[in-house]
C-alpha cells in the first residue's frame, strides 16, 4: 500500500524547505512543544506512518549506529528499509534514507512541504477553536516529513 497526501500542497523548492526546516517560526504558535503536535500533524495527513512498520530506537548514546545496524540487518534479509536520524553531516536530506541512500532533494522538499501544510492546517483549526497554536519545532516538522 502506498501513501499519497490527502490534500493539495504548495511544493517548496529544496532551499526553501531547508530554510523552513531550520526555522519553523512562521507556522508555529506558543502552546509549547508537545507530543500531540506530531500526532495531530500525522492525523491531518491521514497517518502516513500506518503504511509501514517502524522500529524506534531511543536512548542517550548510540542511536544512529544501532539504527544503521538494524537497517543493514533487515535489508540483508530482503526487507525494504527507510531510516530517519539526526543530525545530518552535511546536507539536511541525509537525515532521511531509503534503501541505504539519502532521499533526493526533491523528496526532502516534498516531505517538508506536506508537513508544513499539515502544521498550518492543524494550527488554523486550533486557532478557530480558541486554542493556542502548537509550537512546531524543527524536529516535529522533520519527523512528520520523514513519514511522508
What label would you give each PLM region?
Residues 62-63, 89:
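Short active-site-proximal "capping" loops at secondary-structure junctions
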Residues 35, 40-43, 48-50, 76-148:
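ATP-dependent carboxylate-amine ligase catalytic core
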Residues 1-59, 66-79, 83-84, 124-133:
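Short functional linear segments
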Residues 63-66, 104:
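Short, electropositive, low-hydrophobicity segments enriched in small/polar residues
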